[in-house]
Amino acid sequence: MNAKILVACANGAGTSLMMKMTAERVTQKLNMGVDKIHHCALSEGVSSARQYDIVFAPLNFLNMYEDAKKAGVIVIGLRNVLSDAEMEEKLVESGAAEKFSA
């Protein structure tokens, strides 16, 4: 099974694009199957999060994704949104790396 991943930041422009590139590197390193990685602003992310398997957002905005979390989406908050190491650690801790193993 391949994952659909959403990465969201405040404006959905530069930082979320860099988060997307980080997610691409990390999921490849973990040998995860990924159908798509979409980047957007937090507001778009909140309304579309249920359509994804995994959502990455800054830690201080995590509460905005409670509905998605209740619906079974793996919601991951990041302290440093551009850290490969943190993203990798959180994917492993959450079980997502194993669940979506290629």
Features from the language model and the residues they span:
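Conserved active-site segments centered on acidic
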Residues: 2-43, 51
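A short, aliphatic-rich alpha-helical micro-motif
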Residues: 48-50, 70
